[in-house]
C-alpha cells in the first residue's frame, strides 16, 4: 500500500504540449516517465528537482530505459544536471556512437541538488515505454573528497553521516574557523644563560594562524646575542615585505624586523638582558620555520693565577660575568682565607668586571701537637719537631714497666686531613699496658728454710698491704694491671655471728675505711718507695661463702693508678692450671711461729700439694677443700702462711719467660705450719674469667 501511494505521488500523466516541474525532498524515491509502463505521450516535458540535506549527494540509477533514438538525442531524452552542470543526457534503447543509454551506470551529483528532465518531441512513430529510475541520498566523505585547502582540516578529519569535523595533534588547539590548528605559544620564558628557540614543530611546517611570543629574561648585567641557523623558511611575498608570516625582535622600544623568506638574519647583539621575539603566521602556507640559539655575554674579568700548591677550576682563558671559580689546594694543603682554614673557596666574576674576592693562599696542613699517651713518650722524626703534612712521630711506652698493646709500631703520620694516623689504629692512640711479673730485683729460689725468711726488698713488687686508716695492716693483696688489687674476700668483712653466719652489706668494709699501700717492705715503718692509695670500690666474688671459704676472692678498685717502678709492678694472671709439686712462693707480713709479727716482708717457698691429699688431710676436721681452692705446704709442717697473711700472693716462676704468675691468694688453714695441715689458697686459675670480666686486665 505504501509503495502504491508513493507510486501515485510520483508517477502521473501529463497532457500534450505541457511542461511540469516536480519538487522532491525525500531521502530516496522513484521517478517514471509519464504513462509508464505504457508508452509515454508526445510533446511532453517533466522536470524532477531533487534536494537532500547538506553533507549528502544524490545517487541516480535506472531500472528500465526505452526512448526514441535520435542523433545526439535531438528528439526524446532524459537530461540529468545540477545548478550549473549537465551530468548526463540519455536516449534510445542502447548506447551507440551518437546516443547514450544509462544502462548500469550510476549518476552521482556533486552536491545536494539534482535536476532530471524528461522531454518527448511531437511525434513517435513507434511505441516507446519510457523509463523507470530510482534515487537515494548518500553521505559525502568530506575528509577524502575535500580539495579546497581553505576548507580542509589541518591535522585530523573525522567524517560522520551528513558532515565532518576537524581535530588537532597534542599540543595544538583548534582555531575558531574549526579547521585550522594553531599552538598556544604566547608565554615562553627563557632564563638560562644559553638556549635554543624554534618555531612550533620545527623542522616540520609551522602551524597556521599562530601568534607566538618568546621572552628571554636574564639577570641584569648580561647581554643577549642571537644567532639564527641555516634553516630559515618563512612565507614571504616577492613584492611586499613579509605580508603573511614574519619574525620581529623587540629590544626595549626598538623593533628589529620583520624577517621572512629563506635567508636567515645576520647575528644580532641586542645589548640588553631582556628580549622579546614575536612570530606571526597567517592561515595558509607550508613553510618549515626557523631555529635560533641565544647566548648571554657579560663583562670580562681579569685573568686568574692559581695559588702556590693550589689550582682553580674551571681553568679558562677568559672569564665573564657570573662565571664562578673554585679554588682548592694540593693534597696536604688547606685553603687559608682571613686566617680561616677551609677545603675550598669560591669567587665570582661580577657584572662590573671585577672578582668578588682575592685568590686565597694554600697553607700546608698542620696536625699540631700530638695527644699525650698515658705511660708513654713521643719522639719526633724531624729535628725541628715538625707537625705538618707527612711528618712522623713515634709513640713508645715507659719501659721497662709498660709495653705497647699488640706490639704496635707506634708510628703516626700527619695526614692530609690534619690528624695523626697509624696504619693499624687510625687516629686512635696506642695503649700502654703495665708489664707484669718482671721485677727489677731477682731472687734466688730458697732451699728448705724453716719458717721462711725476710724477702729481699723489691723482689715482690706486686704485693699490696691492706691497712686501716690508722696505719694498722690487716691483710695482703696483689696488684693486677694498673688499678686493681686482688685479695681474699674474708678480708673485706667483719667476723660473722656464729649463730647467724649470714653475710650482709652492713658487715662489709666501706671503701673509706681502709687504704692500699704499694711498694711496702717494712711492716710498720715507712720509706720513700711506698705509695698510699685510696679505694674506689670493692667487689666480692658472687659465689663467695664466708662459712666454707669457697670462692674466697675479692677485687679492690683503686681511686687512682700507682706509678710503676722497681718497687711497684703488677703480677701476671695464670695462663693455665698449676702442676702438682711445683714450687711456689708465698709472701706476707703475718705472724711467725713465735706468734709475733715480723718487721719486714717475709716469704716462704713451698710445693703445691695434690688436691686429693689436701682433701684427706682436712676430712677429719670436716672441712671441705673444693675445686676453687689449691693447697701448698710441707707434710711435716713448719712453713706456712699465718694470721695477717690473708689475701697475700702465692706466685710461681715461668723459667722460660722469666715471669712470675699469680697462683693463689692466702685463704685459710688449720693453725700455722702444723704437720699434715697444708695451707689452703683461693685458686686464681679457677676464678680467672671472673677476674678478667670485672677488671679487663690482660697479661
Swiss-Prot record:
Ranges where the record places region Homodimerization: 20-184
Main location group: secreted
Q: What is the effect of changing residue 237 to A?
A: Loss of interaction with FCN2, FCN3 and MBL2
What, per the annotation, is the impact of changing residue 274 to A?
Partial loss of interaction with FCN2 and FCN3. No effect on interaction with MBL2
Ranges for domain Sushi: 299-364, 365-434
What would changing residue 99 to A do, according to UniProt?
Partial loss of interaction with FCN2, FCN3 and MBL2
InterPro entries from the UniProt entry: CUB_dom, EGF-like_Ca-bd_dom, EGF-like_dom, EGF_Ca-bd_CS, Pept_S1A_C1r/C1S/mannan-bd, Peptidase_S1_PA, Peptidase_S1_PA_chymotrypsin, Peptidase_S1A
Q: So where's the catalytic machinery, residue-wise?
A: 490 (charge relay system), 552 (charge relay system), 646 (charge relay system)
Annotated positions of the (3R)-3-hydroxyasparagine modification: 159
List locations, semicolon-separated.
Answer: Secreted
Which UniProt keywords are listed? Answer: Autocatalytic cleavage, Calcium, Complement activation lectin pathway, Disease variant, Disulfide bond, EGF-like domain, Glycoprotein, Hydrolase, Hydroxylation, Immunity, Innate immunity, Metal-binding, Protease, Repeat, Secreted, Serine protease, Signal, Sushi
Q: What's a GO cellular component annotated to this UniProt protein?
A: nucleoplasm
The Peptidase S1 domain is annotated at: 449-696
Which terms does the UniProt entry file under GO BP? complement activation, lectin pathway; negative regulation of complement activation; proteolysis
State the residue spans of region: Interaction with MBL2.
20-184
Query: Transmembrane residues, as ranges?
Result: none
Task: List, alphabetically, the Gene3D superfamilies matched.
Answer: Complement Module, domain 1, Laminin, Spermadhesin, CUB domain, Trypsin-like serine proteases
Family to which this protein belongs:
Belongs to the peptidase S1 family.
Put simply, this protein is called Mannan-binding lectin serine protease 1
Amino acid at each position: 500500500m505504501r509503495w502504491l501511494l508513493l507510486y501515485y505521488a510520483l508517477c502521473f500523466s501529463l497532457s500534450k504540449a505541457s511542461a511540469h516541474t516536480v519538487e522532491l525532498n525525500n531521502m530516496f524515491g522513484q521517478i517514471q516517465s509519464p504513462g509508464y509502463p505504457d508508452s509515454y505521450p508526445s510533446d511532453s516535458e517533466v522536470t524532477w528537482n531533487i534536494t537532500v540535506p547538506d553533507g549528502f549527494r544524490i545517487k541516480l540509477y535506472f531500472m528500465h530505459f526505452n526512448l526514441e533514438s535520435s542523433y545526439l538525442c535531438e528528439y526524446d531524452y532524459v537530461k540529468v544536471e545540477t545548478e550549473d552542470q549537465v551530468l548526463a543526457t540519455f536516449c534510445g534503447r542502447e548506447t551507440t556512437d551518437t546516443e547514450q543509454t544509462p544502462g548500469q551506470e550510476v549518476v552521482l551529483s556533486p552536491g545536494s541538488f539534482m535536476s532530471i528532465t524528461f522531454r518527448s518531441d511531437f511525434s513517435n512513430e513507434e511505441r516507446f515505454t519510457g523509463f523507470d529510475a530510482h534515487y537515494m541520498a548518500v553521505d559525502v566523505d568530506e575528509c577524502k573528497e575535500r580539495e579546497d585547502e581553505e576548507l580542509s582540516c589541518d591535522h585530523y578529519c573525522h567524517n560522520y553521516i551528513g558532515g565532518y569535523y576537524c581535530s588537532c595533534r597534542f599540543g595544538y588547539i583548534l582555531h575558531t574557523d574549526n579547521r585550522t590548528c594553531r599552538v598556544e605559544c604566547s608565554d615562553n620564558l627563557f632564563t638560562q644563560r644559553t638556549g635554543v628557540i624554534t618555531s612550533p614543530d620545527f623542522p616540520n611546517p609551522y602551524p597556521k594562524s599562530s601568534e607566538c611570543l618568546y621572552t628571554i629574561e636574564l639577570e641584569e648585567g648580561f647581554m643577549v646575542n642571537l644567532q639564527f641557523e641555516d634553516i630559515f623558511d618563512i612565507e614571504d611575498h616577492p613584492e611586499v615585505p613579509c605580508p603573511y608570516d614574519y619574525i620581529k625582535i623587540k629590544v626595549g622600544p626598538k623593533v628589529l624586523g620583520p624577517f621572512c623568506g629563506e635567508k636567515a638574519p645576520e647575528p644580532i647583539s641586542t645589548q640588553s638582558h631582556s628580549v622579546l621575539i614575536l612570530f606571526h603566521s597567517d592561515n595558509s602556507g607550508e613553510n618549515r620555520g626557523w631555529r635560533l640559539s641565544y647566548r648571554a655575554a657579560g663583562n670580562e674579568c681579569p685573568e686568574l693565577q692559581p695559588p702556590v700548591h693550589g689550582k682553580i677550576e674551571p681553568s679558562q682563558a677568559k672569564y665573564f660575568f657570573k662565571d664562578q671559580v673554585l679554588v682548592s689546594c694540593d693534597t696536604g694543603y688547606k685553603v687559608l682565607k682571613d686566617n680561616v682554614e677551609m677545603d675550598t673557596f669560591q669567587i665570582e666574576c661580577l657584572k662590573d668586571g671585577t672578582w668578588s674576592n682575592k685568590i686565597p693562599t694554600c697553607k700546608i696542613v698542620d696536625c699540631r701537637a700530638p695527644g699525650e699517651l698515658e705511660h708513654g713518650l713521643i719522639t719526633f722524626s724531624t729535628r725541628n719537631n715538625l707537625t705538618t703534612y707527612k711528618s712522623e712521630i713515634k709513640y713508645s711506652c715507659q719501659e721497662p714497666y709498660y709495653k705497647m698493646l699488640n706490639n704496635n709500631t707506634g708510628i703516626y703520620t700527619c695526614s692530609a686531613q690534619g690528624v695523626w694516623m697509624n696504619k693499624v689504629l687510625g687516629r686512635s692512640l696506642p695503649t700502654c699496658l703495665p708489664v707484669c711479673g718482671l721485677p727489677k730485683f731477682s731472687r734466688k729460689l730458697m732451699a728448705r728454710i724453716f719458717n721462711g725468711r725476710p724477702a729481699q726488698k723489691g723482689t715482690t713488687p706486686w704485693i699490696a698491704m691492706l691497712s686501716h686508716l690508722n696505719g694498722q695492716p690487716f691483710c695482703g693483696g696483689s696488684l693486677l694491671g694498673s688499678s686493681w688489687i686482688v685479695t681474699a674476700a674474708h678480708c673485706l668483712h667483719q667476723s660473722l655471728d656464729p649463730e647467724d653466719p649470714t653475710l650482709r652489706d652492713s658487715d662489709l668494709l666501706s671503701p673509706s675505711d681502709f687504704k692500699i699501700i704499694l711498694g711496702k717492705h717494712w711492716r710498720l715503718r715507712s720509706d720513700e718507695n711506698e705509695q698510699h692509695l685510696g679505694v674506689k670500690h670493692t667487689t666480692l666474688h658472687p659465689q663467695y661463702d664466708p662459712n666454707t671459704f669457697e670462692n674466697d676472692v675479692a677485687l679492690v678498685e683503686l681511686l687512682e693508678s700507682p706509678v710503676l717502678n722497681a718497687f711497684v709492678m703488677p703480677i701476671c694472671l695464670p695462663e693455665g692450671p698449676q702442676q702438682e709439686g711445683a714450687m711456689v712462693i708465698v709472701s706476707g707480713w703475718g705472724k711467725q711461729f713465735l706468734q709475733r709479727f715480723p718487721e719486714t716482708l717475709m716469704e716462704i717457698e713451698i710445693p703445691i700439694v695434690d688436691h686429693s691429699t689436701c682433701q684427706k688431710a682436712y676430712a677429719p676436721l670436716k672441712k671441705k677443700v673444693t675445686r676453687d681452692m689449691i693447697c701448698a705446704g710441707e707434710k711435716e709442717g713448719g712453713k706456712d702462711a699465718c694470721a695477717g697473711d690473708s689475701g697475700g700472693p702465692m706466685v710461681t716462676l715461668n723459667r722460660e719467660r722469666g715471669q712470675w704468675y699469680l697462683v693463689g691468694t692466702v685463704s685459710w688453714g688449720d693453725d700455722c705450719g702444723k704437720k699434715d695441715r697444708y695451707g689452703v689458697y683461693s685458686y686464681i686459675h679457677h676464678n680467672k674469667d671472673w677476674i678478667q670480666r670485672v677488671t679487663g686486665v690482660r697479661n
